[in-house]
Every structure is written in structure tokens, then in C-alpha cells.
Amino acid sequence: MIDTGSPNTLVDRNSVNTFGLTVEKTDSTVGGLFGRSWERFGASKIKSLAMGNCVVTNVPVAITDLSGMNEDRSAAATGSHIADHKALSYLNGVLGAREMVKFGMIIDCTRQMLYINPNGASSAVSQNLASFLTGRGFTRIPMQLNPNHHFDVEGALNGHGTRFLVDTGSANTLIDTQVAVKSGTGVTALAGYGAGGAGNLVEGVNRTGVKELAIGNFKLANAEVVVAHVSGDVLLSKSTEESNAGVLGQDYLATNFAVIDMGGKTLYLRHPDSR
């Protein structure tokens, strides 16, 4: 899975023997959108990782149990699990943001394409991409790396300023319950349960409508989002300047032609009815 919401590249613990990896123990506990679990990350290195016809070498990876991402779920799921009614290929792991930045990767969420620069991130490539997309009606939204090593963008919920984590590994845009209520967004009754990726933690989720969801200067009216209690560690709730409301997921990234320039730390969006 291509997961901008994961700072590091992860390999499923059940795939370690398949890839012949040697795993070292660490003291770092596994965490996700809904908190931390008892499990501790392992550490390893992949000698050769092929993506299409591009091969990168000596990739450091974290080892964790990702079995929750491979379960068949009939209910809408959130976090780093993409729900689908048809059979999906087994996920051996996720490609994290660290490698995406290092190799100047560009993600086309709508066309489901990943572009890799073997020579690394290039300011010239980012400048050319910016000129090309803004000339075609895309809105440019700068991303920043927050203290948790997640990429986020400025935004607003019903005019209340906040930030959103940019998470291609999340099927849905998910907002913290308390943040939603403070922004004047009503919360419905329990709609189901969602999995928060690494750590396999599960949380009750609701669905609600936001009158105006802003991502930078890009605005969405009457946006439907998932609402759940998100971990304070993820929200950075103790920091007024760095705090966020939750994650901007694939639902609005894919439907608004999102192009993510990881090397240039920029998100581009365009409304479907724009030409």
C-alpha cells in the first residue's frame, strides 16, 4: 500500500520469513489513529525493493502485525484499511513517507499512479509540476512535516481553522469527535467500527456532514466525513499551533484529482467540474 500517513515503510510480521528478513527487537510501541497497542516494532532492512521497473536498495523497515489490514470487512473501514466488497491482494506492507520524500515520489491519486525519481527529489521537477498543474486549474496547498513526522496541511471545518494529515492509506476522511463538535458539526449515532492500521486497534465510528471543509484555499461544500475518537498523540492536541483535526483520506483525494509531490511537499487539488 502507498501510505503517506505512515512515516516509515512497514512490513507485515507474517511476511518476514517470506522475504528472508532478519528482525531486531526495539522498545518502540506500535501506534495508530486510535492509540498505542502492547506490540513493539521490530526493525530490519530490505536489500532490494522493486516498484514497477524501479529498484531501491537498503530500505530500513519497521516490522509489525498488519493482519487487520487483510481481513475481509463488510462495514466501512477507516484509518489505513481500505474496505472493498471484492477480494483484494494480500498486503505484505506499506510504503511510507520517508522513502517517498527521499526519491521525490509523485502520487496521482485519481489515476492510481506512482512516479519515482531514482536520483532523488528535484526542485526543478517540483517547479515544473507546479507550473503544469496550476495552469490547469489545480489549487496548490503546501504540506509540512509535523513533530510526529506526518505530513499535514492547513484547513478549516465550518470556518474553524485547523490542520489535516494527508493520508493516502485511509479510505475515508476522518475527523476527531471532539474537534467535530467544537466546529459545530453534529455527530450521528454509532455507524460501525473502523480499524486504525498498525496496532490493529478498533474504534466505534460515526458519519456526519460538514457544511464547509477547507483544505488550504480549496473548499468542499456539504462534505460527508467519518467521525471517531482519535488519539491525542496523533492529533498533537497539547500543541495549539501544531494540532490537527484528523486525516484527509482517499475519498476526497481521489475524487478531487489529488496529485501529491512528496519531494516538493505540496498537495494539488482540483474540483471534478473544473476544466
Predicted regions and their residues:
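Pepsin/retropepsin-fold aspartyl endopeptidases
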Residues: 1-275
